[in-house]
Amino acid sequence: MRVPGPLRPFLAALVAPLLFVPGPLRSDTGASKTAPGKEPIRWRSIASGNSEAKRSGKPALYFFTAAWCGPCRLLEGQVFAVPEMAAQIERDFVPIEVADRARETGRNSPEMLALADRYGLRGFPTLVVSRPGLAENLMLEGWQGREKALEFLKTAKKRFLGLEKKPR
């Protein structure tokens, strides 16, 4: 079908945003929605995730994100939505979503603000890996591409898994 010349820009404006729909989409609860048969990441709240990290000794993977953050959707779609990566993250880390809700609710939770201050958050997305009892943490700021994110997770796994706890 041939589209008449004057309608082409209008049609392109309608279709172009559909090409960049991020995945996975999120529900109001923050749970990832993925296609059937795929293993989504079960993001924990700050409180339950911190508790689980302390109990299990696994490093916490903090995902600082916001609903309005386009680069956050790229990270979700190109890294977190990949079934193998989701399974690896669930196995090696305690994934904790730290969502900025200031635009939606007018404020952020005290827990979110405390973590943002603790790690010197400067923007979204930001990944921080920290293990309870260790003074050290690793941080990846901004969307730097799929390969950089995968490299970051691999480095964090090597650095934090199997380490003895050092007092803070």
Model-predicted regions and their roles:
Residues 43, 85-109:
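Thiol-based oxidoreductase modules, predominantly thioredoxin-like and allied folds used
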Residues 12-22:
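Bacterial N-terminal signal peptides
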